[in-house]
Swiss-Prot record:
Site positions for Interaction with substrate tRNA: 105, 127
Protein's UniProt name: tRNA dimethylallyltransferase
Family classification: Belongs to the IPP transferase family.
Catalyzed reactions per annotation: adenosine(37) in tRNA + dimethylallyl diphosphate = N(6)-dimethylallyladenosine(37) in tRNA + diphosphate
Broad enzyme group: transferase
Binding site for ATP: 14-21
DNA damage found in the keyword field: no
Database matches in InterPro entries: Dimethylallyltransferase (IPR039657), IPT (IPR018022), P-loop_NTPase (IPR027417)
Gene3D superfamilies: 1.10.20.140, P-loop containing nucleotide triphosphate hydrolases
Function according to Swiss-Prot or TrEMBL: Catalyzes the transfer of a dimethylallyl group onto the adenine at position 37 in tRNAs that read codons beginning with uridine, leading to the formation of N6-(dimethylallyl)adenosine (i(6)A).
UniProt source species: Shewanella halifaxensis (strain HAW-EB4)
UniProt entry tagged with the keyword Nucleotide-binding: yes
Gene: miaA
Region named Interaction with substrate tRNA: 39-42, 163-167, 244-249
Length: 308
């Protein structure tokens, strides 16, 4: 890929419920740009309400690329995102417009801007073997294995995160090298100039209230029925990345009778707040960010001024 630092892209990062979408739509109206979604929940079809997917009016005003691109039963990696995002960026730039990358999935932003390590492709035989071992011995035993071969990854990956735990073991068994060793090598650099913004309220209580209000609004819009439809498909379960999106797991547990309605609401709001906290932690360590206050009247002008 040709390196062309004279061509700009804009990134707009932020925690969930911080006002990213509203600002992005205003930018599309005022600035010659097109939106690329950077969100690991919005990629899924049939998951509209619980992911706060832009509605028909918002999509008409400002079409979003890389949403509704895969089925909830399928997987989609950071490497898949990087490939697809670079293709979308190139297409937008070729038509004389500015790509506007908007979202809160920091792993996707990191993969896009910093590159990825050359990890081995998935091996179904190895994966099946790991799954059998997990069924026989439990994920804790496999986590103990990981701790012996890759203590750094074991510290980062929880025993109750089977997808990432299995992947770390799979990488080692295929390559003979730990995930930590392999991630020291990165793929090619991002070939464009990135003007980077982050939006969040300075008062965390404001964000917490926004999260609570938004989830309760989702419920009135039919979120429970949405999860019921997904559950009724019969090919989805709580171990899939799609069903680990905040809110979906808790609603699924409610529909299974594991928790009552009030507990579901409380757990979903808490899980969303925890997600926002993790996103803010990433952002505080992110270099070269221009910070915006959620709801500030001059946000649009600030972005346009720095992006010219």
């Amino acid at each position: 890929m040709t390196d062309n630092k004279s061509q700009k892209v804009i990134t707009l990062m932020g925690p969930t419920a911080s006002g990213k979408t509203a600002l992005a739509i205003e930018l599309v109206k005022q600035y010659n740009c097109e939106i690329i979604s950077v969100d690991s929940a919005l990629i899924y079809k049939e998951m509209d309400i619980g992911t706060a997917k832009p509605d028909a009016a918002e999509q008409a005003a400002a079409p979003h690329r890389l949403i509704d691109i895969i089925d909830p039963a399928k997987s989609y990696s950071a490497a898949d995102f990087r490939r697809d995002a670079l293709a979308q960026i190139e297409d937008i730039l070729s038509r004389g417009k500015t790509p506007l990358l908007v979202g809160g999935t920091m792993m996707y932003f990191k993969a896009l801007l910093e590159g990825l390590s050359p990890l081995p492709a998935a091996d179904e035989v190895v994966r099946a073997q790991i799954a059998c071992e997990a069924q026989e011995f439990g994920w804790q035993a496999l986590h103990d294995q990981l701790r012996e071969i890759d203590p750094v990854s074991a510290e980062r990956i929880h025993p109750n995160d089977p997808q990432r735990l299995a992947r770390a073991l799979e990488v080692y068994r295929i390559s003979g090298q730990s995930l930590t060793e392999l991630t020291k090598t990165k793929s090619e650099a991002f070939p464009y100039e990135a003007v980077q913004f982050a939006i969040a309220p300075s008062d965390r209580k404001v964000l917490h209230r926004a999260i609570e209000t938004r989830f309760k609004t989702m419920l009135t819009l039919g979120f429970t029925a949405e999860v019921e439809r997904l559950k009724a498909r019969g090919d989805l379960d709580l171990d899939l990345p799609s069903m680990r999106c905040v809110g979906y797991r808790q609603c699924w547990q409610y529909l299974d009778g594991e928790i009552d309605y009030e507990t579901m609401v409380e757990k979903a709001i808490v899980a969303t707040r925890q997600l926002a906290k993790r996103q803010l932690t990433w952002l505080r360590g992110w270099p070269d960010l221009i910070w915006l206050e959620s709801g500030a009247e001059d946000n649009l002008a600030t972005v346009m001024r720095h992006s010219r």
